Amino acid sequence: KTGMLGSSELVELVAATIDKYDLHNVVIDPVMVCKGCDLILVPDAAESIKKLLMPRCDIITPNTVEAAYLADMPEVTTVEQIKEAAEKIVAAGAKSVVIKGGERLSDNSAIDIFYDGKEFVEMAVPKIYPSYNHGAGCTFSAAITAGLANGLSMKEAVLQAKKFVTAALKHGFAINNIVGCTNH
């Protein structure tokens, strides 16, 4: 499982390591955008993730802003656009993708969509307020990794991870008057 990879050199090293050791169950959490909508990575690192890691991963877990970048779309703000982005990401080489709609969609549900090139699985739960969600994306990709390590199929690992993160969000807590985090 990867997290934030801040340079193209680091992305190249991860790609070479995946190849060298013929790694399986590779979970890429692209971490290109945090709370806002602007890329926090230098452009060459983001482009390297797209070109070098997407084709090597078993699953990639972008939020909607990251998915728009990875799919070369101007924005991803609806369920239909999430599905379109998912198709493009898989067509670009990822074996599967789960796009985290979370709180970014204007619905009352936190919707994540899994796609493995064959079927879409929509996972919707009511949004949780207050939203102490710092670390939710990293927790989600780590929980998918744990499920795969325990022998679950990709779909089962994603579904279990969604339940785990939902519980962690329900018990989240404030860090200060601006942000709070998941509790797991």
Feature map (PLM): residue ranges:
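Glycine/small-residue-rich loop that forms an oxyanion/phosphate-binding "nest" at active or ligand-binding sites
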Residues: 2-55, 59-62
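Glycine-rich beta-alpha junction loops
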Residues: 6, 32-34, 66, 102-105, ...
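Nucleotide and nucleotide-moiety/phosphate-recognizing core
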Residues: 19, 119, 155-156
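Conserved phosphate/ATP/ADP-binding segment of small-molecule kinases
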Residues: 43-119
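Short, small-residue alpha-helix embedded
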Residues: 68-69, 130-154
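Short pre-catalytic strand/loop immediately N-terminal to key active-site residues, enriched for Gly-Thr
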Residues: 120-134
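Charged C-terminal helix
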Residues: 155-184
